[in-house]
Every structure is written in structure tokens, then in C-alpha cells.
Amino acid sequence: LITSLQKKQKGLQNEVSKKRREANQLNARIDKLIAEEIERARKRAAEEARREAAARKKAESKEGKSSSASRGTTKKAAPLEAYSMSKADRELSGNFAGNRGKLPMPISGPYIITSHYGQYAAEGLRNVKLDNKGIDIQGKPGAQARAIFDGKVAAVFQLNGLFNVLIRHGNYISVYCNLSSASVKSGDTVKTKQAIGQVFSDATDNGRTVLHFQLRKEKEKLNPEPWLNR
């Protein structure tokens, strides 16, 4: 009996180690892609600021206002470092934030949240904790992952044979993981509730169909549940 229990404990420990290793691998990839997307957004905003400054200068020159600079009446443009988002991104961010608590679930059909945001005890093991950077949502086989808001696909990547999708909503980013297929590609514009891929169903686990979903505000990890209309 003791040997049997020890084997069971060893099996659970191996399972937890594998789960933690895969989660760390996934989160490292997500963090890297988000950092790259933030840098791209910064460059877009800086370019927009440069274009606006050039347009203002041209307009002032045409109106003969260039001499106003010597009188100290010309407004100084904000430094480029102040621009982290383009005008379109700022508007989209405001709309997204205004829908906190009203966003649709990122999975189609009936569902249950099987793992919540934050630390939780590993089942069957004492003093062992795991840290969920998002939430796990179990649906029915054939369930689709769907965009929670209008946005643009920032990245689509594969890891361990499964697809993962990042969608940018201004400075918010929603992340959809554990997909068997993806129906969008990087750069695509998506609408609220648009299907973006099929959630993987594990044939070795009675067709268990689980979407791992994360929400970020740039690099900050957010608890998705208060944002969703459950």
C-alpha cells in the first residue's frame, strides 16, 4: 500500500513538474511577443507624432506664422517619448476599458471555469502551488475560441503542436491558448465574438476541451474574470 501511494505521489509530482515547465515555456513566449508588440506600437505612435508635427509646421508656414516662434507663442509638441500609443490605439483602449465586466466569454457554447487566476494548490500534493497567469475555461468538444473585443491580431504561434493567438485592443492584449487550429493570422482585424480558432479536445482525456485565456495591459497581467460578462 505504501509503495502504491509513493508511486502515485511520484506520478503527481512528475505531472505537476511537466505542467509547470510547459506553463513557463508558454508564458515566456507570450511575454516576448508582447514586448515586441509594445515596441512596434511605440514606433507607430512616434511616427504618427512626427507626421503630425510636420503637418503643423507646414500649415504654420503657409499661414505665415513661423515668426510667432520668436515671440514665444508657439506651442511645443510633446516629446516623442510621451507617445506610447497612436490615436487609434488610444481610442480603442478607452473603448475596451469602458466595457470592463461586459466583455463576452472567449469560448463558444456552455462552459465552466476550471482554474482561476493566481496561485492555487496542486491537487493531491501538499505544499505545492502553481501560478495561473490567466484562467482555464472548459467547454464542449468543437468549441471555438472567440475574440472578446474588436482588435488586431498581434501574433499567432505554435507551441507543443498547439496554436496560440494574441489580439491587441489598444494597449490591452487578450491571449487565447490551447487551440487545435487558428482561423486568423497576424495583422488581421477581428470583431467582437469573431471565431479565431477551435479549442483543442484531448482524445486521451475523454475529449476534455480547455481554453487557457489571459489578459494583459501591456506587460501587466490582469485577472480576466472581472472583465468578462459571465
Regions found by a protein language model. Name each.
Residues 116, 156-157, 199-202:
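Residue-level recognition of beta-strand microenvironments
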Residues 1-70, 79:
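Alpha-helical oligomerization segments with coiled-coil/rod-like character
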Residues 81-101, 114-147, 170, 210, ...:
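Short glycine/threonine/proline-enriched tight-turn/helix- or strand-capping micro-motif at secondary-structure
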Residues 165-168, 186-230:
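Conserved, short, structured surface segments that act as functional micro-motifs
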Residues 105-115, 143-153, 193:
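Generic structural motif
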Residues 15, 125, 201-205:
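Short proline/glycine-enriched turn/loop segments at secondary-structure junctions
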